[in-house]
Swiss-Prot record:
Pfam families: SlyX (PF04102)
NCBIfam families the record matches: PRK02793.1 (NF002750)
Protein source organism: Klebsiella pneumoniae subsp. pneumoniae (strain ATCC 700721 / MGH 78578)
InterPro entries: SlyX (IPR007236)
Protein name: Protein SlyX
Family: Belongs to the SlyX family.
């Protein structure tokens, strides 16, 4: 192969590599942002579940509140 052809191919590979490095960095930033957002959402969900449990009375009566069964 000619030197100019090799130089052209090398330049093309370097260009592709640079583009891929930028893409990988962008994807890494996106994944990191999503992980942070998911952690926040998990915490919000945990707090909502706690509030829901605290505000909703149980529909199951305790044993002391239950009427005794009829005797046959």
């Amino acid at each position: 192969m000619h030197d100019s052809t090799l130089e052209t191919r090398l330049a093309e590979l370097e260009s592709r590599l640079a583009f891929q490095e930028i893409t990988i960095e962008d994807l890494n930033k996106t994944v990191t942002a999503h992980e942070i957002e998911m952690a926040k959402m998990r915490e919000h969900m945990r707090l909502m579940i706690e509030k829901l449990k605290a505000t909703q009375p149980s529909h199951i009566a305790s044993q002391a509140e239950e009427t005794p069964p009829p005797h046959y």
